[in-house]
Amino acid sequence: MLFGLYVLLTFLTLVLAAAVSRSGGRQLWFSLLVLGWIVSQLNTLLEAVVFSVMPWTHAAIQLAISLVVLALLAALAVLVVGRWRRRSVEPPPLDKSLGTLGLIILAYEALYWTAGTFVWPFVADFYADRPLPPVLAVIALQVPRSLIFVAAAWPWLRTSPRFAPFVLGFAFAMIGGIAPLLPD
């Protein structure tokens, strides 16, 4: 039952992201697929594998299955908002400077540790009998994870979405944070 809620929340988030996009067709479908799959699966499972919470073989199977599911959900989201036949838009220029990437990394580190403080009471039982990784290892892993999140958002940002900061923040929180925390 809760898996169904997880899928529904993910789908509704993709519908929102599709609805505010000015693009359509395969460009929009691909951007939703990348956003949904990387945020909900790849970047989360990376941490699980690196810190030995899940073996790589299990993560690979989950990644493959979720790629198919999210491809279908992204296509359905584009269809629901009536954008499958809409032409792609010319993407706006995006700031790719090292300074911007540095600020993204710092902001992600701050958000990661802040969110972790709030989430800890809900996940502490899961980690009760597992050794926690060294803090410096966790900090170091967040650098590539922050850049992976940038890569996840990049194709969608290229669709010229309206309200991008709010929708992207909501999408990251919902499909990367809230929905995965639903109990099995």
Regions of interest found by a model, annotated:
Residues 1-184:
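Juxtamembrane/disordered regions of integral membrane proteins
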